[in-house]
């Protein structure tokens, strides 16, 4: 995939109507936004376009309204909050069909530097099917397209891909530009040693990532629930731990592939286990890889955490996706905490691949110590798999 895409700074936007796909899929509680990170992330692109005298038409999805208007998934709270953040009224075009009379009138009345926000793009069933009729309607409002929603870049929808069939000038905003810079460099030309850490519950979620990264990394660290399938593949007993029986054979193949490629594959050598999946369960540390009958692994053990931390400290590039244990239970959070600490203390380029790892790092207060925290869980995973992301492929090459 070509990561060298035109950015907003490469196109002339003065006086032009610019359709900007943002990711405003934020959590709401009784109409109040409970996490503003995605709004904050969109501000640099919006402010740049305002400063250049563009007419800015923002669009985004929120939640899964499944192709029909749902009041609780309206973007009205986003328009209100953005107005406060930008010190300028963001005009909300409240059309159930997204591109209706309100939107058309609002866009017609725009002056340079004005900002309009369209209604939730997923109010239209065509959006997720990338059907031409809605792509055309969206594109008809604008002269230029800017995509700044990395979180949906792995989806070919009307507002991420379809519009580029009608708007020939298509560039990325600052958020996507940053993602491409850090994730692209990590995958294509990392500073070595390059260490990748994969956690989370399932091998099946990360099959292609493991396979692709074994061609690129110097060290691959595996923790979390998926570690037990690997331990079983090595012939250890895993008690009642989470296991994907149908992935044991695949895990053996990956262990062999690592040897073949000269990749240092690090797997747990001890575990923190309990007799039930419960936040109040008593933690027990195993002496080695084996987990006894009646117990389940819920975190990597202290010896493993030390080995993983040392590997991270000697790296020049680190990518992390997925926690090392049941991070939400205090007794089983230590593995994740130790990995996060090692990354925070490191001078390497440190990249967090969205999702649970990003949440863990932010909860621990290490967010500002990381080089880059990806804004897209699913998109960053597909990026690490080496897949082409449709929402990025559709943008103009530099």
UniProtKB/Swiss-Prot annotation:
Pathway: Carbohydrate degradation; glycolysis; pyruvate from D-glyceraldehyde 3-phosphate: step 2/5. ATP binds at residues 206, 297, 328, 354-357. It is an enzyme of class 2 (transferase). It catalyses: (2R)-3-phosphoglycerate + ATP = (2R)-3-phospho-glyceroyl phosphate + ADP. PROSITE patterns: PGLYCERATE_KINASE. It is found in: Cytoplasm. Keywords: ATP-binding, Cytoplasm, Glycolysis, Kinase, Nucleotide-binding, Transferase. GO terms for cellular component: cytosol. It comes from the Bacteria. Transmembrane segments: none annotated. Gene3D superfamilies: Phosphoglycerate kinase, N-terminal domain. CDD domains: Phosphoglycerate_kinase (cd00318). Its EC number is 2.7.2.3. Disulfide bonds: none annotated. Its main location: cytoplasm. Substrate binds at residues 23-25, 38, 61-64, 122, 155. GO terms for biological process: gluconeogenesis; glycolytic process. One of its GO terms (molecular function) is ATP binding. Pfam families: PGK. Monomer. Belongs to the phosphoglycerate kinase family. This is Phosphoglycerate kinase. It comes from Clostridium botulinum (strain Okra / Type B1). The gene is pgk.
């Amino acid at each position: 995939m070509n990561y060298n895409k035109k950015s907003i700074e490469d196109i002339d936007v003065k006086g032009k109507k610019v359709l900007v796909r943002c990711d405003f899929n934020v959590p709401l509680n009784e109409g109040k936004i409970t996490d503003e990170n995605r709004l904050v992330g969109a501000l640099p692109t919006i402010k740049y376009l305002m400063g250049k005298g563009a007419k800015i038409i923002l669009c985004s999805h929120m939640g899964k309204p499944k192709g029909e208007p749902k009041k609780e998934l309206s973007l009205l709270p986003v328009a209100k909050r953005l107005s406060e953040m930008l010190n300028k009224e963001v005009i909300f075009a409240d059309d159930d069909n997204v591109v209706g009379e309100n939107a058309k009138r609002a866009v017609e009345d725009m002056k340079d530097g004005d900002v309009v926000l369209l209604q939730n793009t997923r109010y239209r069933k065509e959006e997720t099917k990338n059907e031409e009729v809605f792509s055309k309607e969206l594109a008809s409002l604008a002269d230029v397209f800017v995509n700044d929603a990395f979180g949906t870049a792995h989806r070919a929808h009307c507002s991420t891909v379809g519009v580029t069939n009608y708007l020939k000038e298509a560039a990325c905003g600052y958020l996507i530009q940053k993602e491409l810079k850090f994730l692209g460099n990590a995958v294509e030309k990392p500073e070595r040693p390059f260490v990748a850490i994969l956690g989370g519950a399932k091998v099946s979620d990360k099959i292609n990532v493991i396979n692709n990264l074994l061609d690129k990394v110097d060290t691959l660290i595996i923790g979390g629930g998926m570690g037990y399938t690997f331990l079983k593949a090595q012939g250890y007993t895993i008690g009642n731990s989470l296991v994907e029986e149908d992935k044991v054979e695949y895990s053996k193949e990956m262990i062999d592939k690592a040897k073949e490629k000269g990749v240092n594959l690090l797997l747990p050598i001890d575990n923190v286990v309990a007799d039930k999946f419960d936040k109040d369960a008593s933690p027990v540390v195993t002496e080695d890889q084996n987990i006894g009958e009646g117990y389940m692994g819920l975190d990597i053990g202290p010896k493993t955490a030390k080995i993983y931390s040392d590997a991270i400290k000697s790296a020049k590039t680190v990518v992390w996706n997925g926690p090392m244990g049941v991070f939400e239970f205090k007794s089983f959070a230590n593995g994740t905490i130790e990995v996060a600490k090692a990354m925070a203390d490191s001078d390497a380029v440190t990249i967090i691949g969205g999702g649970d790892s990003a949440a863990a790092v932010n909860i621990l207060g290490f967010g500002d110590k990381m080089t880059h925290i990806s804004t897209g869980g699913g998109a960053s995973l597909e990026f690490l798999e080496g897949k082409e992301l449709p929402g990025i492929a559709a943008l103009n090459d530099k």
